[in-house]
Amino acid sequence: MSGFRLEHADEYNHAAGTESNFNESVYVNGFELERRCGGWMRLGNRANEGHAETQVCMYLPDGRIACQFRRPEISNNEAFAAGGLSYEVIEPFRKVAMHYEGDIMVLDDPELLRDPVRLFKTAPTTPAKIDFELEAVSPMHGGEPLSPTQETMYGRDFSLGHFNQHMRSRAAVDIGGECWRFDAWGWRDHSWGPRYWTNIYFYRLLIANFGPDRAMMLLKITDRGGRTRRQGVLQYDGDYEEITDMDLYTDWTASKDPRHLRLGVRTARRAVLMEGEILRLAPLRNRRKVGDEMLQSRIAEGLTLWRWDDREGMGITEYIEILEDEEPVGYPL
C-alpha cells in the first residue's frame, strides 16, 4: 500500500501525542460460520484523559449476546492491559493474542443495549474468560502516512496511523461455566492518533472472511461536507486487491437498523456482487458533550452472514453515524 510507512515497531505502543484525545487501540475478532457465532474485543488507551476504553462483545451460539464496556483508569500508554483485557504481540505482522477475564453481561434481548443506564443496572452478569489467538492469512494493510497530504482511512481526526489484517482466529470462551471453542477466521486492526467517535459523520464498514484465501474489508465514509470516499480491499487467492469502486444498498428494520445488504465491488482484476444478512445486532452508542451541546453517535455492530459466488462467509458490519434530532444522518443510505 503506497504512501504509508509500517514497521515492526508499530505493532507496539507508540508515544502518546500531545492531543488531549490521543487514542491508541487494538481490536480483534473471529467468527465461526457453522454455528453462526463469534465476537470481538477492543482496548483503546486514552492516556491523556486518564482512562482506557474496554469493549467485549460475543455473539453466543444460542443466540444471546455477552458483552462488557468499561473505562478503567490508566496513567500512561506503555501497555495494552486494562480492566481485565490484555493484548500481546507474539510475532510482528504474523501472530497476536487478546485475553479477557472478568464479569460479563449476558443478554437474552440485545434491545437493552439501547438504554445503557438500564443496562448496567439490570443486566445479569457472570464471570467470563475469553482467549483469542490470531495468525495472519493476509498481507498487512495500512500504516502511518508519509506526507501531510496523504489521505488516511478514517480521516486524521479519527486516527493518524492505522493498519489491519485478516487472520485465522482461534478462541476459547467460558461464559459462566458454559464453554465453547472455535477455530475459524477473523480480522484485527491497530490505530493511533487523535480520536473522538463523534468526529465520524457517517460510515459503513464491512469486514468478512470466506475461508483462508478470500476476504473483504470495505469502507464507505461521508464527511459533514457531503464528500463520500469508498476504499478497502478484497482478498482473492490470498492477495489483497485495492478496490476502485463500491456500491452498497441497505434494507432497514422499523428501528432504522441495517438488516440486509447488497454490495457491488470492483478492483482492477474483477467485479463481484455479494449479499449480506445481519443475523444479530448490538445497538451501541457514544456520547460527548461540547459546550452546551451533547453529541451522540449510534454504533451498530452486526454479526453478518455473507454470500460471494459459491462461498458463504461471516464477519462484522459496523454502521457509525451522528444522530441529529434523534435521527441517524446516514439513513437510508
Feature locations, PLM:
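Structured soluble/peripheral alpha/beta segments that form catalytic or ligand/cofactor-binding pockets
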Residues: 1-333
